[in-house]
Amino acid sequence: MDLTAIYESLLSLSPDVPVPSDHGGTESSPGWGSSGPWSLSPSDSSPSGVTSRLPGRSTSLVEGRSCGWVPPPPGFAPLAPRLGPELSPSPTSPTATSTTPSRYKTELCRTFSESGRCRYGAKCQFAHGLGELRQANRHPKYKTELCHKFYLQGRCPYGSRCHFIHNPSEDLAAPGHPPVLRQSISFSGLPSGRRTSPPPPGLAGPSLSSSSFSPSSSPPPPGDLPLSPSAFSAAPGTPLARRDPTPVCCPSCRRATPISVWGPLGGLVRTPSVQSLGSDPDEYASSGSSLGGSDSPVFEAGVFAPPQPVAAPRRLPIFNRISVSE
């Protein structure tokens, strides 16, 4: 069976679709007119007719026509005109709200100070003269502590903007409270590793002896420092070692006699070390309990107290037992 005959028989079943003829024309099925709903008029076949059937929006998109004002439907109020990009307020316009920086007019303008004029004029963020200079809102501890980088390395990357003290004139601490000396003195009398600010003028005086302080001692308050040189240095003719006037009874007692009593500092008594007590285990036990094996100066009275008469040194109980047993 020919495929063309099958196709024509299928088309004849539908009365709406025209059946193509062998001559290239179209013929309608019996009972239907030539003018149907799908038939095209001669005017519609022209390109101008196709363009006229397109809606207005499609025409504006294709041909670039601007769509004018469209009236609202009946019963609706007209819409407000939309602002274009040129009418919308920009964030950089003068009417926009801007927050003033916290450092506004808190520093002098370097250009104005050097040349007497500034190209920014009234819009400059820095002060043009002392009349425009404002006081900045600082932290309560601003410029009250030393800058560690400046005193350890000799320089600070922040410079004048640093919040810590670089020079003594920058100290903004409350008056009446003297600065606390955070300097620990080592056994040799020299300051420990880190540098600190120089002492106030009231503390300038004779240098302290190398063995006046223990390794962990700290300087006393400024009010307790007498500035008398006699409190720090002994007289040239004063002997540093005074022996016990009482006769010694044995060599161990002679070795155990206190080494020295510092004359000018009556409260500082150098205690004998463990090695000076001989080789008796009992002596080591008693000396360890009473002395702790310390060879450093002992603070009994005030270190900076005025000179007091030197009292005779007292003997340890171990020596009394040795003398009684002999």
From Swiss-Prot:
GO terms for cellular component: cytoplasm; cytoplasmic stress granule; cytosol; nucleus; P-body; ribonucleoprotein complex. Residues 13-66, 78-102, 175-245, 273-292 are annotated as: Disordered. Keywords: Cytoplasm, DNA-binding, Exosome, Host-virus interaction, Metal-binding, mRNA transport, Nucleus, Phosphoprotein, Repeat, Ribonucleoprotein, RNA-binding, RNA-mediated gene silencing, Transport, Ubl conjugation, Zinc, Zinc-finger. The keyword DNA damage does not apply. Changing F319A: Abolishes interaction with CNOT1 and impairs TNF mRNA deadenylation. It comes from the Eukaryota. SUPFAM superfamilies: CCCH zinc finger (SSF90229). Residues 97-173 are annotated as: Necessary for RNA-binding. Residues 103-194 are annotated as: Necessary for interaction with PABPN1. P-P-P-P-G repeats lie at residues 71-75, 198-202, 219-223. GO terms for molecular function: 14-3-3 protein binding; C-C chemokine binding; DNA binding; enzyme binding; heat shock protein binding; mRNA 3'-UTR AU-rich region binding; mRNA binding; protein kinase binding. Residues 1-174, 100-326 are annotated as: Necessary for localization of ARE-containing mRNAs to processing bodies (PBs). Residues 1-15 are annotated as: Necessary for nuclear export. Residues 1-100 are annotated as: Necessary and sufficient for the association with mRNA decay enzymes and mRNA decay activation. The C3H1-type zinc finger domains are necessary for ARE-binding activity. Zinc-finger RNA-binding protein that destabilizes several cytoplasmic AU-rich element (ARE)-containing mRNA transcripts by promoting their poly(A) tail removal or deadenylation, and hence provide a mechanism for attenuating protein synthesis. Acts as an 3'-untranslated region (UTR) ARE mRNA-binding adapter protein to communicate signaling events to the mRNA decay machinery. Recruits deadenylase CNOT7 (and probably the CCR4-NOT complex) via association with CNOT1, and hence promotes ARE-mediated mRNA deadenylation. (Microbial infection) Negatively regulates HTLV-1 TAX-dependent transactivation of viral long terminal repeat (LTR) promoter. This is mRNA decay activator protein ZFP36. It comes from Homo sapiens (Human). The lineage of its organism: Eukaryota, Metazoa, Chordata, Craniata, Vertebrata.
